[in-house]
């Protein structure tokens, strides 16, 4: 049975999450609250919220866990040309934290295959906006001709980034934002992005699954590191164009 958490109740061990044979693998707990303090504690333990309007707050820690190692980010020949154009043409901009709430709302409105409605509710937007104001959540945004056309947002503690959602109004706009994030994190020696759950799109970009035990162990170490700077320089993206994917960083995680 999934435990119900009162305001002062701690999270159970992630090992108590429902298993693959259940109808909701990875479900750990439920609660009525989504306080920033609860959200911060969750991420530091490798737990995230995911629920729909009308449901209680559901907390998850799936096994295995989908991650993206920045050194393993895959760039196709076609996308390489796109990145070169973004770097070359001033009409393309990559901004950080310029319109965090706008990115969240756009992610909420983006159509998703096989999904009706959105889990990015008004309550979720309020909670993550609180983290953003505290400097713990960030948006990476793709702008074209002065208009935001894509982006992503996530949570950052220490040397760990937890990706949440992305959207694109024009082709490749979300992928450009992800490439910018990868380049920025590589610059700051962050070796793992949490992607939560497996999708074919993430796998095509180099994402892969690792055991929850290995994921949680890495999170525990990474969140204790000093926070990274979120001053962004577009030129760091150029480093992705001349460097092949490396398996070096991957050696720290089991496959």
UniProtKB/Swiss-Prot annotation:
Q: Which Pfam families match?
A: Leu_Phe_trans
Q: List the disulfide bonds.
A: none
* Single biological process term from Gene Ontology: protein catabolic process
Catalysed reaction per UniProt? Answer: N-terminal L-lysyl-[protein] + L-leucyl-tRNA(Leu) = N-terminal L-leucyl-L-lysyl-[protein] + tRNA(Leu) + H(+); N-terminal L-arginyl-[protein] + L-leucyl-tRNA(Leu) = N-terminal L-leucyl-L-arginyl-[protein] + tRNA(Leu) + H(+); L-phenylalanyl-tRNA(Phe) + an N-terminal L-alpha-aminoacyl-[protein] = an N-terminal L-phenylalanyl-L-alpha-aminoacyl-[protein] + tRNA(Phe)
Per the record, its GO cellular-component terms are: cytoplasm
Can you say where in the cell this protein is located?
Cytoplasm
Q: Which GO terms describe its molecular function?
A: leucyl-tRNA--protein transferase activity
Q: What is its EC number?
A: 2.3.2.6
This protein's UniProt keywords: Acyltransferase, Cytoplasm, Transferase
InterPro entries in the record, alphabetically?
Acyl_CoA_acyltransferase, Leu/Phe-tRNA_Trfase, Leu/Phe-tRNA_Trfase_C, Leu/Phe-tRNA_Trfase_N
> Do you know which Gene3D superfamilies this protein is assigned to?
Leucyl/phenylalanyl-tRNA-protein transferase, C-terminal domain, Leucyl/phenylalanyl-tRNA-protein transferase, N-terminal domain
Is Hydrolase there in the keyword field?
Answer: no
Entry similarity comment: Belongs to the L/F-transferase family.
Q: What does this protein do?
A: Functions in the N-end rule pathway of protein degradation where it conjugates Leu, Phe and, less efficiently, Met from aminoacyl-tRNAs to the N-termini of proteins containing an N-terminal arginine or lysine.
Q: What is this protein called?
A: Leucyl/phenylalanyl-tRNA--protein transferase
Q: Which organism is it from?
A: Burkholderia thailandensis (strain ATCC 700388 / DSM 13276 / CCUG 48851 / CIP 106301 / E264)
Q: What is the lineage of its organism?
A: Bacteria, Pseudomonadati, Pseudomonadota, Betaproteobacteria, Burkholderiales
